[in-house]
């Protein structure tokens, strides 16, 4: 399986954000990285009561701390593999309440509208088949017991989401699919992929997370799982669960300080320790398992090491090294070689692989670099 190197403009964002008056806020955010416009956020929010925000539009559901942390302030170039199980942006209505020690968000969400393909699928399902858009109900709570400490923060969070089938699914209506790349946007191969799980009645996802900082040290870990509950009239199999977890930490070497956004319940921009900036060392381990009860989508683990250089508050240089270890079931829906058969020939069929436990599957090293402007 040849893995090509590559370059890309990972994100090219253009946004307009405005506090319209003391009570109302509006935002529209787009991405032009692929040469076409992709809608990100389109928000109207009421924030006239301290600690309370009510917003409507297209935005990220409050579920995963990794998903909700803006890409500008990620510890590594890409989010962990298991984040693919977390819901992202959907049309919806959400309420958030926060104070220093407690944070809560709850919302009702509909379809995902990130491009023309999803919009067309929604319109066709409505016009031709009269299908409902599909709703999701997502809630999250966070406790912050160290809110009185000026040099540290502790984030203890949990979230749950009940999800109906969406008419914007580009796989099939009434289907689930769990897939992920190996925490990279350059290697486009999706080693982990259950393919389409038909007969979906609803999904249930939940997560538990711990995060925080102490002076220049930042740490974060989470467990996520998502299950497809099937309609027995269509698919008589049991619930199909996929899950994974990660743990990561970083440290600013020259006296800088990590920071935490209490209103958003997530990490935010660092404070450099020197006039010329600061350097951050980071390490992460992650594991993701898409081998459900009846669909073998593969599992993988990744070891990552990173160096982040912040010459100013709006510029970031990143170098990441990553080792990826995929199992024999991580064959990209049967498209990738994962071992050898009894005759010694490469095979894509995991049932024919003769290598012992831990020997089959695609393993590889990766080195990546990013130059980033963070407005």
Show which residues each predicted segment covers.
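Outer membrane beta-barrel
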Residues: 1-124, 128-166, 241, 246-273, ...
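Outer-membrane beta-barrel pore domains
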Residues: 170-375
């Amino acid at each position: 399986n040849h893995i090509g190197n590559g370059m890309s403009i990972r994100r090219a964002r253009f946004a307009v954000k405005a506090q319209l008056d003391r009570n109302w806020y509006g935002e529209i955010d787009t991405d032009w990285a692929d040469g076409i416009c992709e809608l990100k956020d389109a928000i109207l929010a009421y924030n006239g009561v301290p600690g309370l925000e009510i917003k409507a539009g297209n935005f990220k559901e409050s579920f995963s701390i990794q998903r909700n942390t803006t890409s500008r302030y990620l510890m590594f170039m890409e989010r962990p593999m298991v984040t693919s199980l977390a819901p992202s942006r959907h049309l919806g209505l959400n309420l958030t309440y926060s104070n220093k020690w407690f944070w809560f968000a709850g919302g009702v969400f509909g379809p995902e509208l990130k491009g023309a393909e999803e919009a067309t699928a929604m319109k066709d399902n409505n016009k031709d088949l009269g299908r409902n858009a599909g709703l999701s109900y997502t809630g999250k709570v966070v406790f912050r017991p160290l809110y009185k400490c000026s040099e540290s923060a502790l984030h203890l969070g949990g979230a749950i989401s009940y999800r109906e089938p969406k008419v914007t699914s580009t796989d099939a209506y009434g289907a689930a699919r769990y897939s992920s790349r190996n925490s990279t946007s350059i290697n486009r191969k999706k080693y982990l992929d259950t393919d389409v799980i038909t007969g979906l009645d609803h999904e249930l996802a939940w997560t538990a997370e711990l995060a925080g900082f102490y002076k220049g040290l930042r740490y974060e870990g989470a467990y996520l799982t998502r299950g497809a509950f099937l309609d027995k009239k269509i698919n008589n199999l049991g619930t199909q669960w996929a899950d994974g977890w990660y743990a990561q930490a970083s440290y600013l070497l020259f006296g800088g300080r990590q920071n935490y956004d209490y209103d958003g319940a997530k990490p935010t921009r660092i404070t450099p320790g020197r006039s010329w900036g600061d350097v951050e060392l980071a390490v992460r381990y992650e594991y993701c398992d898409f081998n459900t009860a009846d669909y073998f989508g593969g599992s993988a683990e990744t070891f990552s090491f990173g160096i982040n250089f912040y010459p100013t508050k709006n510029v970031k240089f990143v170098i990441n090294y990553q080792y990826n270890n995929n199992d024999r079931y991580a064959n990209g829906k049967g498209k990738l070689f994962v071992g050898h058969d009894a005759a010694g020939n490469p095979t894509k069929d995991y049932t024919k692989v003769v290598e012992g436990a831990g020997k089959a599957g695609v393993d590889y090293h990766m080195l990546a670099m990013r130059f980033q402007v963070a407005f």
